[in-house]
Amino acid sequence: SEMCIRDRYMPSNIYAAKAASYLEQRMKACDSSGGIIECRIDGMPVGIGEPVFHKLDAMLAGAVMSIGAVKGVEIGDGFLAAGSCGSKNNDPFYMKDGKPAKETNHSGGILGGMSDGSTILLRAAIKPTPSIAQEQKTITRDGDETTITIHGRHDPVIVPRAVVVVESMVAITILDLLIHNMSAKLDNIRDFYLSRD
């Protein structure tokens, strides 16, 4: 319902109403819909990730792509960057209270495979639920063409259910990289054990 969509997944009353109406149309048509989940990570320390083999963006994308219904991942401006130019896509740096800061965040908080201290922005494209009540073409085990109709109750969209899955995969990946980063430097290991007293 519209209230469930608004309260749990979509803070905008206007878009929650539009989403509820759209999903009702899909249900009446015995069809389904995909969608996009946006995940933001605030407070990430600078320098998490590696410049080549354990790039933060590659690790996050790999983790999120391993979720069954995910068909695409973008970081920052993602595919919009392909139509941009360097002068517009680069994130200008400046000093704020004695620390580096960025005017924009087209990179989505990751530069050169490592976190840059700004908000990490990730989007996951979720495919439409394949189990729909419309008749669909298929083939048998023997290769004969046929049709199939799936009966039962099916969700018109799984995007809301996948939000917590995306959050969990991102959190596990971030934790793994934080532990890896901590143990990669001898000073960090020494400080960790000395601070336990």
Give the positions of each predicted feature.
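Phosphate/diphosphate-binding glycine-rich loops and adjacent basic-rich segments that engage nucleotide
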Residues: 16, 21-34
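Short, mixed-charge, low-aromatic patches
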Residues: 13-22, 126-133
